[in-house]
């Protein structure tokens, strides 16, 4: 996404980059704008956004379609409780549709709720790789 563009225009560009045609973008745009929860700020340039506002916009665009692989990096750590809850629900929908979600998070409850498999990285090295409960038990014991 581009800082010099408005949030709305970034949504359009982001959806076009995901392979949607202009008509599909027009149809999807209102729902994506609403999901961001940015209100009137959606028509401001992204360079004026806080980091949380940027994260909301990025997450909304990335999850507006059904990619085969979705990478989410700490996105559920931003925003108010309502946004975090609807973001978690959106991730659940992607997982239910057999999509692969790679979630980067330090939030153990989020990991427990969202992940079937966990890879614990520390200092760039894999410490553990396996079922969520097993890896988190090792992590918590360390």
List the predicted regions and their residue ranges:
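Conserved ABC nucleotide-binding domain
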Residues: 22, 26, 32-48
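H-loop/switch region of ABC-family ATPase nucleotide-binding domains
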Residues: 105-106
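A short, proline-enriched helix->beta-strand linker immediately N-terminal to the Walker B motif
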Residues: 64-72
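ABC ATPase "signature
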Residues: 129-130
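Q-loop/switch helix immediately C-terminal to the Walker
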Residues: 5-16
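A short, surface-exposed alpha-helical micro-motif characterized by mixed small hydrophobic
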Residues: 111-113
